[in-house]
């Protein structure tokens, strides 16, 4: 598990460097003209100003999951995603009981004042028991990810993500579910009414049923 005790080693492995005369570690992303920083003195995770953070509790050392979110954002920036297209802790009201849910990471395909198109939603967990429990729940009933998907029906992917630090290496798992109907399955549905599609599902429960019955609970990897 990534934690406060090994976090500096993780950062060093990821290419962060310690600023002279301080306990701040930093890494720049020239192609995106932004940087990530970690302030160990104040125990703060500092994200680019262009990136939207809805809940500042994700920016402290208080929860081990925050380190996973930070590592995942680093991976996204490394892959070239724009910081202004990333949001942390986006909140929705879920279900009839008006309970709220917060997605760890949302990445947009388009994000302007006129138009916002979600690309994918990521739920982050610490490696080991927490991740294994979340995956079990995901397979059994869809968990929170399917509720988020229902709120953002335009999203193309949802994923369950965990990262770890083992034997001096940063490792990760990323269980990805496509939210788009397969073209061949759509053709089958035209001939067979028993084949159900995501586009005809109206609730998180129905989305899960389609994933289970039509797509056999298929995961993708990146």
Across the structure, where does each feature detected by a protein language model lie?
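Active-site-adjacent loop/helix micro-motif of nuclease/hydrolase catalytic cores
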Residues: 84, 97-100, 114-119, 128-142
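Charged, often low-complexity linker/regulatory segments
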Residues: 1-75, 180-222
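Short secondary-structure junctions
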Residues: 76-85
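Nucleic-acid nuclease catalytic cores
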Residues: 87, 129-184
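Active-site metal-binding core of divalent-cation-utilizing nuclease and nuclease-like domains
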Residues: 20-37, 56-61, 84-116
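Short His-Asn-centered micro-motif
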Residues: 89, 108, 124, 160-163
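Short loop/turn motifs at secondary-structure junctions
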Residues: 82, 102, 117-118, 153-157
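Conserved catalytic cores of phosphodiester-cleaving nucleases, focusing on short active-site segments
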Residues: 72, 103-109, 117-131
């Amino acid at each position: 598990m990534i934690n406060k005790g090994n976090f500096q080693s993780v950062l060093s492995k990821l290419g962060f460097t310690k600023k002279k005369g301080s306990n701040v570690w930093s890494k720049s992303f020239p192609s995106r003209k932004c940087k990530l920083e970690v302030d160990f003195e104040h125990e703060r995770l500092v994200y680019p100003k262009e990136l939207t953070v809805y809940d500042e509790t994700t920016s402290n050392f208080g929860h081990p999951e925050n380190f996973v979110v930070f590592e995942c954002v680093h991976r996204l920036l490394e892959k070239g995603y724009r910081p202004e297209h990333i949001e942390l802790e986006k909140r929705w009201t879920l279900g009839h009981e008006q309970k709220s849910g917060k997605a760890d990471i949302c990445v947009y395909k388009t994000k302007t004042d006129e138009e916002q198109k979600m690309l994918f939603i990521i739920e982050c967990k610490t490696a080991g028991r927490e991740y294994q429990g979340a995956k079990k729940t995901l397979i059994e009933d869809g968990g929170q990810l399917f509720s988020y998907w229902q709120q953002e029906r335009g999203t193309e992917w949802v994923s369950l993500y965990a990262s770890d630090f083992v034997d001096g290496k940063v490792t990760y798992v990323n269980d990805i579910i496509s939210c788009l109907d397969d073209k061949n399955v759509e053709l089958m549905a035209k001939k067979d009414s028993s084949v159900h599609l995501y586009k005809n599902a109206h609730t998180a429960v129905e989305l899960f049923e389609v994933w289970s019955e039509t797509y056999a609970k298929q995961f993708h990897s990146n």
